[in-house]
Amino acid sequence: DETKKVYPFDFAFTVTQKLSGRTVTVIWEVENTGEEDLYFSVGGHPAFMIPEQYDIVFNKDLRNHGETELEYVLIDPETAGVDAAHPRKLSLINGKIPYTRTLFDEDALIFDNTQVERVGVEVDGKPYVTLTCKGFPSVGVWSKPKADAPFVCLEPWIGRCDNVGFDGELKDK
């Protein structure tokens, strides 16, 4: 089996998608079918077509709190690892930031440490799409860098690419 050559674990991975009204629920189930500890990461890659002007909205509890900040990290283009040694701050007003053409010029904004429980898009102050990601250690938000792409990706991750300089084992990720 090709997977076993690069990922030597016995497992079953099931994705269930349910549609109920205007809500899509996605359930990931990872089952260890072997005897050894199972080390894994999993993340979604949902992209949403959006209008030209929109706001990105974070965590419902940040609404009406004036100015707040979230910490994010970027992927180092030279190593393809996360530059966790140089976190940045994203300033929000009432839990949101307007999209600007330069927002994703340095690639994905990666929010670690379960800071983001909900992220979405508002258009003209009205909810357009919302992703609930409570319990996910990391969330990536991005669109095509240096372009006015007609989409935004809101990605929940259990695990992400390594930090710059990491050379440990899979079990240490």
Describe the role of every protein-language-model region:
Residues 2, 32, 121-125, 145:
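Short acidic, glycine-rich loop/turn motifs
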